[in-house]
Amino acid sequence: MDVRTLLETTLSGLGYELVDFELGHGGLMRVFIDAPAGIALDDCVKVSNHLTRLFTVENIDYDRLEVSSPGLDRPLTREADYARFAGERVRIKTRLPIGERKKFAGTLVGLADGQVELDIDGERVAIPLASIDKARLDPQF
């Protein structure tokens, strides 16, 4: 079982969602989690303790483990995220230019037929999901 599948299965069983994970320099593993009610410090501690034991049993090689929430500007990594966060401001970067631009910011309308739809200053823009390199929430204060 690969690390992503192991994390997704384990976190789901604990009531959390794997947003993303990174394997960094020096054996650092960062795990970003979320839950419908949000994430508190106690959640991070609980998941960290559980994953530490799990990684020992599964012989996963890492030196340091960091568990945290994805933050206010969380990445959108799954198709379900585009429905969950409809109505929110987002920033999207595409792999290749679409209409001479690669960066888009607007209100997320949703996902339909493989197209992410944004409202950018009253204009609807459709971006193929497969073309998206990065997508993040863009909270406005």
Curated annotation (Swiss-Prot):
Example GO biological process term?
A: ribosomal small subunit assembly
Give the location in the cell: Cytoplasm
Record keywords, A-Z: Cytoplasm, Ribosome biogenesis
GO CC list = cytosol
Pfam families, alphabetically?
DUF150_C, RimP_N
Question: Which SUPFAM superfamilies has this protein been placed in?
Answer: YhbC-like, C-terminal domain, YhbC-like, N-terminal domain
Q: Which domain of life is it from?
A: Bacteria
InterPro entries in UniProt:
Ribosome_maturation_RimP, RimP_C, RimP_C_sf, RimP_N, RimP_N_sf
Q: Which NCBIfam families match?
A: PRK00092.2-1 (NF000929)
Q: Which family does it belong to?
A: Belongs to the RimP family.
State the function annotated in the UniProt record.
Answer: Required for maturation of 30S ribosomal subunits.
Recorded protein name is Ribosome maturation factor RimP
- Origin species: Laribacter hongkongensis (strain HLHK9)
Lineage at the top is:
Bacteria, Pseudomonadati, Pseudomonadota, Betaproteobacteria, Neisseriales
